[in-house]
């Protein structure tokens, strides 16, 4: 059997499995407009930057429109093929690596996103090692693809966690894109990955997501401009990780510095978290008061 015949057989089998996996409610319109397409929204060169900011604040300027339904269906197809044939994904950190090398020793404003699997230890105890590797790798790559689709950069994979960051000439758009990405990640888990896993009697995968905004420094460990490891360091990285650790399964938490920059219609979907000083010990670096965190209302 040649490669084309194998592919045709995979697609036919997949469609049968996909029909069974589609026993879920879809919310197709909820996220279609969350992120925006820059190519559709560029203003003519004679318009002032102030006009662009006003339009963006009113929700008129759009950078990228994501077809979330199509993405979820493609996710299902990739996960199914991975489980059956060990399909490999394309590299997704190269873009970030190239970008950071151009900005070594610079301080950059960015929204940082951490997404991590919940209870991965239990998964490792229930499944064969080779299946665990495929599932976790596929999960990480699907999260990375969501980051890329929202004009973000994939910084790195750490165990069963993925770290991304979002930048834009308008930090408000960067914040909106980051939050839209986080929301799509939850949908990908609920509607893309887990239905396929369930068809194999595998347990659901759950995630918790944390975001924060601020300054970070790009550092290079070594003198080789092309090969030495590059990374991002700064308080935003640390706080985003702490915020993520506080999130419940399938929950999105954002720091106040992100909340302040997202569109008012998106802000309405978040509520302030009330934690004791023993639960949350981190203060705002500007005010010295406990740093406020918000959760997305499901």
Kindly give the residue locations of the regions a language model identified.
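Catalytic/regulatory signature loops of cyclic-dinucleotide turnover enzymes
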Residues: 212, 235-260
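Hydrophobic alpha-helical membrane-association signature
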Residues: 135-139, 181, 236-239
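Catalytic core of nucleotidyl cyclases, primarily class III adenylyl/guanylyl cyclases
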Residues: 150-174, 194-233
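Catalytic NTP-binding/metal-coordinating core of nucleotidyl cyclase/transferase enzymes
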Residues: 99-177
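Intrinsically disordered, glycine/charged-rich C-terminal tails and inter-domain linkers
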Residues: 1-92, 249-298
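Short gly/ser/thr-rich secondary-structure transition/capping motifs
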Residues: 92-97, 192-194
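Serine endopeptidase catalytic core focused on the charge-relay Asp
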Residues: 185
């Amino acid at each position: 059997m040649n490669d084309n015949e194998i592919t045709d057989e995979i697609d036919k089998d997949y469609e049968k499995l996909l029909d069974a996996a589609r026993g879920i409610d879809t919310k197709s319109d909820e996220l279609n407009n969350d992120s925006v397409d820059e190519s559709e929204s560029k203003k003519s060169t004679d318009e002032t930057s102030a006009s662009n900011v006003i339009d963006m604040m009113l929700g008129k300027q759009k950078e990228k429109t994501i077809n979330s339904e199509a993405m979820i269906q493609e996710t299902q197809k990739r996960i199914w093929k991975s489980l059956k044939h060990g399909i490999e994904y394309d590299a997704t950190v190269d873009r970030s690596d190239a970008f950071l090398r151009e900005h070594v020793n610079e301080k950059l404003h960015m929204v940082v996103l951490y997404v991590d699997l919940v209870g991965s230890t239990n998964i490792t105890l229930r499944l064969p090692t080779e299946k665990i590797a495929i599932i976790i790798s596929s999960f990480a790559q699907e999260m990375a693809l969501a980051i890329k689709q929202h004009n973000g950069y994939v910084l790195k994979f750490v165990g069963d966690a993925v770290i991304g960051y979002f930048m834009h000439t308008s930090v408000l758009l960067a914040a909106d894109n980051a939050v839209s990405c986080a929301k799509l990640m939850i949908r990908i888990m609920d509607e893309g990955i887990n239905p396929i896993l369930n068809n194999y009697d595998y347990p659901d995968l759950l995630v918790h997501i944390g975001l924060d905004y601020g300054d970070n420094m790009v550092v290079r460990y070594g003198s080789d401009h092309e090969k030495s490891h590059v990374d991002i360091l700064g308080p935003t990285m640390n706080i985003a990780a702490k915020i993520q650790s506080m999130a419940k399964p399938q929950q999105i938490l954002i720091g106040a510095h992100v909340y302040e920059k997202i569109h008012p219609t998106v802000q309405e979907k978040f509520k302030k978290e009330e934690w004791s000083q023993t639960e949350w010990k981190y203060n705002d670096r500007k005010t010295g008061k406990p740093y406020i965190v918000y959760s997305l209302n499901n």
